[in-house]
Amino acid sequence: MGLITKLNESFGDTTLPQIRRDDFLSGDNNGVLFLGDFSDAFSWRGGTSTPTNGAVLYDIAEKNDAVLALFTNDGENIAGGGLDFAPDGVSPYSAATGVVELPAAVSSTIWNTGGTNEHNYAITMYGKFLDASWWDSDASIEQFMGSNIAYNTGDAWILAALQSGTNGDLSVRRDTGTSSQNSASSATGGRFKDNVSNAITQLVVHTYGDTLSWRYKTATTTVSGGGAALQTITHDYSSSKLQFGHSTAFGGDPRPLKRLYRMAVEDLTTSGRDPIAVADADWNRVISRFS
């Protein structure tokens, strides 16, 4: 007969690897501040129900849950593993809004990890863009990732957007003060508009190596750019809220982001990781989820 003893304590081998909800978190030294994914049942618990204001996108890192905001009931739904802004293929151009909004605690944490030009972070987004034939050539900026505050009006943090005009470039701007910023726009490797047309795209904006840089990747194209030295920040962006989707900070038409799948924010000062190496490994693990 065996002996069974019940203890009121638990014992564990601290040398065993920690099992995380998502491999993106493995080895992050607790530096990932947010990881959300509409194809993950823990993160998005709404199934295929119509997304509405106030719905929660739970943080897989279990720190900073996000909420859906600014939705105008313009046909948004859940499809292909992501939040679909335009099931009819037209609504992005009708001034529809809708974002995944992170709490200000994310911006505040990044702000407090370094001095005025030492905020090291990586922001990653997976999205699908509409066919470039739908995009127009006006001069507006269509933000799909960035602060809820416009860089030219207040204490914003970051912006990534389609810079329209005839070129259809990617515009990345790190706010350094009202109406001043580090700018790193795409002008090489082919036009952003053409490269991401009707494509599932991973975009990484980061300050690894103390430069403002970006990299976008599709199944057929990988383009990197930026590399500008970080300029001193003269305002406090810690109260701003990071948004993914169709923002109102810079929300001119067209709005070419069709689907939003997966988002992450990482404090590189804490994690010490190379964001591009992390992004490449993540792409290989998760890209098959999205359509």
Q: In which residue ranges do the predicted regions lie?
A:
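Solvent-exposed strand-to-loop "edge" motifs in beta-rich extracellular domains
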Residues: 39-41, 125-135, 150, 206-208
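A carbohydrate-recognition surface predominantly in extracellular/luminal proteins
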Residues: 33, 81-82, 86, 101-145, ...
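Flexible glycan-contacting loops in extracellular carbohydrate-active proteins
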Residues: 225-261
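Glycan-recognition/cleft segments
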Residues: 142-178
